[in-house]
Amino acid sequence: MAFDDIYTAGIASGWKVTDASILQKNQTLEADVVIVGTGAGGGTTAEILSQAGLKVLMIEEGALKTSANFKDLDESRAYRELYQEGAGRASSDGAIAILQGRAVGGTTVVNWTASFRTPDHTLKHWADVHQVKGHSPEDMKPWFEKMEQRLNIAPWAMAPNPNNQVLNDACKKLGWEWHVIPRNVKGCWNSGYCGLGCPVNA
């Protein structure tokens, strides 16, 4: 079962979308708040502010794509159209590939849905080294729980494929601790195209 496309539903409910690539003349737009970037951070901020009654304008470098655009699952076109630098972005020394989304929704459109809590040692590091306050494991627990419920985050219940079963068996043999990575999906078809845009909005 495919789920309703949030962009199609949003536009139907009154979202106004302007594709600047086809504008023939300048436009003046008015808003209480302008947010640059429509990924997880920008999208969440826009939701909170709009629910508070503010008029929000979001600016996004990439195009607006819906699940209808992902039906053909054309890999070469997906990389070209949905990723920064055609999925060729990397750290300055070239050692780390940075698969960053370039579309309305940012990297939430093209990711592998891994969703885990910020580790306690990382929160402690932020507090000790960067003096970040109010983000201890105890402080963050209710927020993690809220988002896990909202985003349907849970370990994937499917049996491991043969590749992962080998890793599973090896970890057990070596006495290593292992866990299934929690994912933020609902109704996933296991098509394996998470990085190309989900055709069923899982």
State what each model feature region is.
Residues F3-W126, P137-E138:
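N-terminal glycine-rich phosphate/pyrophosphate-binding loop and immediately adjacent elements
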Residues M1-G14, V129, K133-A202:
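Conserved redox-cofactor binding core of oxidoreductases
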